[in-house]
Amino acid sequence: MPRPQRSERVRELLRARHFRADLFGARLLADPAWDILLLAYVAALEHGRLLMADLCRAGLVPATTTVRWAKTLEKEGWLTRSSGPIEDPQSWLELSPMGRRNMERYLTFIESSRPA
């Protein structure tokens, strides 16, 4: 799937997650690690990396939770940081090669599972 279409598909997933949170409550169904990976993947498709401040603003959870999960994802090898401490709103994050590869595999699976 071309990048613009895939980017829009991931944005649809994010909008659906936000709508679900509105209906059922963000605390009940929070999944900050997955939200971070989806946002980082959109950034990878559109411009390469993601500013920590933007990541914190986009989340459905408090900024401290976003930072904690971003640290975990970095430690586990899903994200890389290109400047400053991760707590710094001006830090840049991006998917690691492993993160990008697995997000590609996941979206390919989702797309191939959709009815035509």
Locate each region found by the language model.
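Short, cationic-aromatic polyanion-contact patches
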Residues: G84-L107
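Short amphipathic alpha-helical elements of helix-turn-helix/winged-helix folds
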Residues: L39-A43
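Short acidic, hydrophobic short linear motifs in intrinsically disordered regions
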Residues: E46-A58
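General nucleic-acid-binding
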Residues: M1-R6
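A short, conserved structural fragment
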Residues: E74-P85
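Short alpha-helical segments that sit at the start of domains
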Residues: V10-L38
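Short amphipathic alpha-helical interaction segments
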Residues: L60-K75
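Amphipathic alpha-helical dimerization/coiled-coil segments
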Residues: R20, E104-A116
